[in-house]
Amino acid sequence: MKKAIIDLGKFDYLFGKASGTKNASHNLPRTKQNLAQMRRLGVPDDVNGQILIQNHFDGIVNEPSNIIKTWTYKNSQFEIRESLFAGPGGFAKFESAWEIMSDGTRRFTTVIIKGGH
């Protein structure tokens, strides 16, 4: 089973702590939306929450039937995967984007969390 590659900064993005100026007009509102969703789903902003997300993403990158879109950009290949995330406080549909690395592993780039308010 291949492990999903998730850069540590992506956990900041998921838990409302993204910073910086790169794409700030998009990333800052999105990181706040992600934080609200993580809270609604009952995912703690700690190592246990990171493990929950890592385990979910490890499972989905090993399931070929959940790929809903693929594309190439600047000699890199990407895909969107659809999944149902079950948190301690509820469920949400994840549309996660992945860069396909040369060895076939997947590197997490972003996610759109759908469902709930």
PLM regions and their residue ranges:
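A short, surface-exposed interaction/processing loop segment used at functional sites
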Residues: 90, 99-117
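Compact soluble domain cores
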Residues: 1-83
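Basic/aromatic recognition patch in beta-strand/loop cores that engages polyanionic ligands
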Residues: 74-100
